[in-house]
Amino acid sequence: MAAEGRVQRVASELQKVISLLLRTKIKDSKLATATITEVELSKDLSYAKVYYTCLDIQEAQYISKAFEKSKGFFRSSIAKSLNLRIVPNLKFVYDKSLDYGMEMEGKIQQALEADSKIIKQDDNSLQENYKDSDKETKVEKLR
């Protein structure tokens, strides 16, 4: 249990350090636009999957290659920042959850629009039915 807590703490620190490096030390403006969303660390702290996302999907492939080229820089900077016996091997993975979330949001918006159209149609038909029944009531009163 204690080891899991340490793994999570180190993963959190790795995320902070890599994010800080992206903001302050990376000169590649496209790579600097990437956001680190999560870091998964192996139990022995030797491997880390670093999940990232970027606002421009067309830049994802470029950013992936840039991360691969910059692995050594990130590892050496992590070694200087964190007091770890072993600096984990980094694997950068594009995080598709943001894209998936935006896709789901679009589908929800479409469903809400379709529902509002149906509700408007139902309201209109109810109003027409009410008007028709109101006319019939008036005619019956006249008889």
Curated annotation (Swiss-Prot):
Main localization of the protein described in the UniProt heading: cytoplasm
InterPro entries membership: KH_dom-like_a/b (IPR015946), RbfA (IPR000238), RbfA_dom_sf (IPR023799), Ribosome-bd_factorA_CS (IPR020053)
Gene Ontology molecular functions: ribosomal small subunit binding
Stretches for region Disordered: 123-143
Locations listed in the record: Cytoplasm
PROSITE patterns reported for this sequence: RBFA
Classification via Pfam families: RBFA (PF02033)
Keyword annotations from UniProtKB, A to Z: Cytoplasm, Ribosome biogenesis
Record-level GO cellular component terms: cytosol
GO BP terms, alphabetized: maturation of SSU-rRNA
Xref: PANTHER family: RIBOSOME-BINDING FACTOR A, CHLOROPLASTIC-RELATED
Family stated for the protein in its record: Belongs to the RbfA family.
Subunit description: Monomer. Binds 30S ribosomal subunits, but not 50S ribosomal subunits or 70S ribosomes.
Function noted in UniProt: One of several proteins that assist in the late maturation steps of the functional core of the 30S ribosomal subunit. Associates with free 30S ribosomal subunits (but not with 30S subunits that are part of 70S ribosomes or polysomes). Required for efficient processing of 16S rRNA. May interact with the 5'-terminal helix region of 16S rRNA.
Protein name: Ribosome-binding factor A
Organism name: Francisella philomiragia subsp. philomiragia (strain ATCC 25017 / CCUG 19701 / FSC 153 / O#319-036)
Gene behind the chain: rbfA
